[in-house]
């Protein structure tokens, strides 16, 4: 039998190549060999019937927490990669807030080795901005880049020192690395646990004002202007942050941004409606309806470059506690497409823009070899059933985490097949390879 794979009959949506229509995708030797309306194929060729499906570049997630090393009870590189391909993601960027923190080559190399052993999604490590993510001394950026890191972050913690952030932008620029930053002023956050507003008041919970994010975004944009370093704002959640990024781009500054599905779909009123469910607790918190509207508009008009999940698995021990004491974060790799397809159905996004924000957009931000079905590109492909509807059963998730606000909800759209390097690594209804 031929080792060539023909994906036939599907609607190919490849924003990077300007393609949107029924095409055949030909994969040979792990690469995209051809995308065309008519293709002659051998009788013994392998065929994937994609009729009534979307065929897109594999999704790229700039922001996941794989927890390994040190917190394997929450997630491992292997289980996180399995969750990724189940959701259509063929490449994920692993945040450095592991134990120990990924601030050196040894941790980076361990993550890469675990990813290679899993043989599922491609994993791109993100190194720490500061040693131990302590915010006091810069990590060794040259060592981190040489060992395989594609960006730098102290995610989970802001860089509170403006002087250190300035030096980080300067140092990272010398190595061609972007900083992907968690923006919050801890002095304004205080002991807040959800968005500051009427919902927090009704629940009797301490609030976090939107300005805690806004002031840090504005500070770091000013430092970009000073240094010329590249800034990527992680999990944007406020209207003020969207405005600041839009203005920075208008001025030609190297500033990009991402937004999560939950910050596009849920508000602080959902926290109240949940009855203190800790599946609705994350950082940044779910914001107001006005903030959600601004984030949707920012994604639609390109102010925000990418959809990123901030996939953050936790154990029941860390979530099944009082709201104030619960860990922040939810799992998102297996629900991202479905949640965001809901935005398309609401008219907030076009189908093309949704695919672009999951593929070419994030690939451009970190300069990754992904997000395209161009001839010669790695054959990383997602096949999607946009008409499917399903009910989320946490017990059926591939991730170790069960912390999701969409438990028991009806969702639209499923990934039926995921291909990495020409290999089918996920097929709906079958165990992943």
Swiss-Prot record:
InterPro entries reported for this sequence: Amidohydro-rel (IPR006680), DHOase (IPR004722), DHOase/Allantoinase_Hydrolase (IPR050138), Dihydroorotase_CS (IPR002195), Metal-dep_hydrolase_composite (IPR011059), Metal_Hydrolase (IPR032466)
Binding residues annotated for Zn(2+) 2, in chain numbering: 155, 182, 235
Q: Name one cellular component (GO) term.
A: cytoplasm
Record-listed E.C. numbers: 3.5.2.3
The protein's annotated catalytic reaction(s) are:
(S)-dihydroorotate + H2O = N-carbamoyl-L-aspartate + H(+)
Task: Name its pathway.
Answer: Pyrimidine metabolism; UMP biosynthesis via de novo pathway; (S)-dihydroorotate from bicarbonate: step 3/3
Enzyme class (EC, first level): hydrolase
GO MF, one term, reads:
zinc ion binding
What is stated as this protein's family in its record?
A: Belongs to the metallo-dependent hydrolases superfamily. DHOase family. Class I DHOase subfamily.
Q: Under what name is this protein listed?
A: Dihydroorotase
Organism, by scientific name, is Anaeromyxobacter dehalogenans (strain 2CP-C)
């Amino acid at each position: 039998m031929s080792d060539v794979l023909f994906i036939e009959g599907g609607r190919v949506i490849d924003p990077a190549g300007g393609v949107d229509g029924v095409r055949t995708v030909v994969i040979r030797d792990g690469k995209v060999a051809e995308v065309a309306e008519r293709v002659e194929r051998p009788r013994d060729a392998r065929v994937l019937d994609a009729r009534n499906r979307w065929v897109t570049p594999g999704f790229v997630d700039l922001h996941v927490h794989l927890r390994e090393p040190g917190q394997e009870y929450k997630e491992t590189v292997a289980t996180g990669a399995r969750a990724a391909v189940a959701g259509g993601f063929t490449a994920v960027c692993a945040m450095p807030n592991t134990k120990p923190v990924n601030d050196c080559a040894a941790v980076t190399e361990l993550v890469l080795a675990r990813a290679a052993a899993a043989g599922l999604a491609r994993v791109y490590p993100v190194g720490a901005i500061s040693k131990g993510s302590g915010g006091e001394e810069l990590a060794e950026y040259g060592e981190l880049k040489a060992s395989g890191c594609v960006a730098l972050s102290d995610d989970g913690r802001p860089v509170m020192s403006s002087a250190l952030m300035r030096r980080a932008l300067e140092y990272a620029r010398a190595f061609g690395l972007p900083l992907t930053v968690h923006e919050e002023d801890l002095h304004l956050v205080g002991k807040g646990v959800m968005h500051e507003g009427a919902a927090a008041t009704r629940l009797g919970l301490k609030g976090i004002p939107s300005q805690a994010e806004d002031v840090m975004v504005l500070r770091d944009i000013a430092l970009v202007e000073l240094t010329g370093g590249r800034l990527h704002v992680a999990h944007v959640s406020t209207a003020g942050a969207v405005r600041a990024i839009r203005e920075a781009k208008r001025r030609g500054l190297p500033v990009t941004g991402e937004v999560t599905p939950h910050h596009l779909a849920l508000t602080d009123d959902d926290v109240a409606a949940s009855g203190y469910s800790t599946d609705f607790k994350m950082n940044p918190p779910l914001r107001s309806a006005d903030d959600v509207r601004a984030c949707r508009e920012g994604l639609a008009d390109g102010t925000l470059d990418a959809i990123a999940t901030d996939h953050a698995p936790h154990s029941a021990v860390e979530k099944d506690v009082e709201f104030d004491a619960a860990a922040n974060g939810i799992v998102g790799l297996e629900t991202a497409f479905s949640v965001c397809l809901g935005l398309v159905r609401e008219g907030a996004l076009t189908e093309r823009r949704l695919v672009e924000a999951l593929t070419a957009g994030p690939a451009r931000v970190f300069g990754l070899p992904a997000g395209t079905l161009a001839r010669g590109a790695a054959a990383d492909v997602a096949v999607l059933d946009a008409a499917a509807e399903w009910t989320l059963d946490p017990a059926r998730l591939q991730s170790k985490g069960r912390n999701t606000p969409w438990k028991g909800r009806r969702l639209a759209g499923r990934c039926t097949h995921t291909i990495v390097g020409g290999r089918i690594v996920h097929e709906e209804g079958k165990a992943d390879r």
